[in-house]
């Protein structure tokens, strides 16, 4: 009997878990795929574990909860108690048939799903200490040292860790002492294929050949995604381009500014309409583990203006597919926006360059090929040394 592949996930992970599941089905088609959802199949089936963990949240994070620097929900998966319970429960659940599995793979790094005796891999978009790379990060929001030690075990219990970006790879090495050859950046792709009925197909642009001077901001977290800074930059843009428009999709900030259009939340099916209407895409985010929304902007051949932090330098090629700047420097941001609004040809060139980046690197087929080849190589090494 052929061995199975074990896939451990939690929820949808913004549809990333669907995309990764498809990768495993495609790349390891000769093996049955078994899926365990940590929330639905493990924690929800153990009420005692759930309630004990709420007590653990209070024990570890009471000062932060009282000061409101952290929310109970954010802390729930960051207690040593839940970390150990997940790890131990999975080990007990599968101990008797661990020989049935070729390997296991988990997405995200909020729990240790490794099982002794099964080669284990991790695919993640962040580490907690990646936040140290962001100048605006509030260190009072750091989770407990005890939990960070549990997080360290996640990476060290894996045969290999795969990251969506190079700065997260560097964090694994610098902050968690993961050997360089045990962590690899494989990037990520757009999840619109599974999140929408239109299968992620880009809508033809409706921006009058990049001449309509519309800037799109698409994001749910207005503050974290740099919305206030964009408004400040946009006011400066209006001094040179009084007909420019800024469309805000995904959130509803209260802002008094000319030509500032709040669209708010829209169904996922309609998000591509707002990419299609834009000439420029701008989200000057202050924190960005990866940023799939920028991949989707490139899928629509839009030039991007964003921040020079996190994963953005690996997504946006400075001066070729977009412009990057310090997210707090609104004067430079305004200049970059004006440069694009004044040159439809530059917009077209940047958009085409970004589109090629998606076709060649930032797509799930490329991610799947790279990850699967690496997993096979690691397994060959493990099994050959065992024999």
Question: Which residue ranges define each predicted feature?
Answer:
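Membrane-proximal helix-turn-helix segments that form the acceptor-binding/catalytic region
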Residues: 141-161
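Carbohydrate-associated surface elements
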Residues: 167, 189
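Conserved donor-binding/catalytic core segment of Leloir-type glycosyltransferases
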Residues: 193, 199-225, 231-235
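Short alpha-helical donor nucleotide-sugar binding micro-motif in glycosyltransferases
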Residues: 266, 273-278
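Aromatic "clamp/platform" in nucleotide-sugar-dependent glycosyltransferases that forms part
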Residues: 286
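Short hydrophobic beta-strand element within catalytic cores of glycosyltransferases
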Residues: 303-306, 316
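Conserved acidic donor-binding segment of nucleotide-sugar-dependent glycosyltransferases
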Residues: 318-319, 323-330, 339-345
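A short, well-ordered alpha-helix in the C-terminal region of glycosyltransferases
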Residues: 332, 339, 346-361, 367-373
């Amino acid at each position: 009997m052929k061995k199975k592949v074990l896939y451990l996930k939690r929820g949808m992970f913004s549809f990333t878990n669907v995309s990764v599941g498809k990768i495993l089905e495609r790349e390891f088609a000769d093996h049955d795929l078994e899926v365990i959802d940590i929330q639905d199949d493990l924690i929800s089936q153990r009420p005692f574990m759930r309630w004990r963990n709420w007590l653990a949240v209070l024990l570890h994070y009471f000062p932060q909860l009282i000061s409101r620097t952290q929310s109970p929900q954010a802390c729930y998966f960051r207690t040593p108690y839940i970390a150990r319970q997940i790890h131990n429960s999975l080990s007990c659940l599968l101990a008797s048939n661990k020989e049935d599995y070729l390997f296991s793979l988990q997405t995200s790094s909020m729990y240790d799903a490794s099982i002794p005796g099964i080669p284990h891999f991790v695919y993640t978009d962040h580490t907690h200490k990646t936040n140290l790379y962001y100048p605006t990060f509030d260190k009072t929001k750091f989770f407990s040292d005890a939990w960070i030690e549990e997080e360290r075990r996640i990476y060290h219990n894996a045969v290999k860790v795969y990251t969506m970006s190079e700065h997260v790879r560097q964090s694994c090495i610098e902050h968690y002492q993961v050997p360089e050859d045990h962590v690899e950046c494989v990037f990520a792709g757009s999840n619109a294929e599974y999140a929408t009925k239109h299968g992620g197909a880009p809508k033809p642009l409706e921006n009058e050949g990049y001449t309509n001077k519309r800037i799109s901001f698409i994001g749910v977290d207005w503050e974290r995604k740099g919305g206030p800074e964009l408004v400040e930059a946009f006011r400066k843009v209006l001094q040179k381009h009084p007909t420019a428009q800024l469309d805000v999709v995904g959130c509803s900030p209260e802002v008094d500014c000319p030509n500032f259009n709040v669209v708010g939340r829209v169904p996922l099916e309609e998000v591509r309409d707002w990419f299609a209407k834009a000439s420029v895409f701008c989200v000057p985010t202050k924190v960005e583990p990866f940023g799939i929304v920028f991949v989707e902007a490139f899928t629509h051949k839009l030039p991007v203006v964003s921040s020079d932090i996190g994963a953005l330098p690996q997504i946006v090629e400075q001066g070729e597919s977009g412009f990057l700047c310090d997210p707090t420097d609104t004067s430079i941001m305004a200049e970059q926006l004006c440069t694009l609004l004044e040159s439809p040809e530059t917009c077209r060139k940047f958009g085409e360059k970004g589109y090629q980046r998606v076709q060649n690197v930032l797509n799930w087929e490329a991610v799947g090929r790279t990850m699967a080849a690496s997993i096979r190589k690691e397994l060959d090494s493990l099994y050959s040394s065992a024999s």
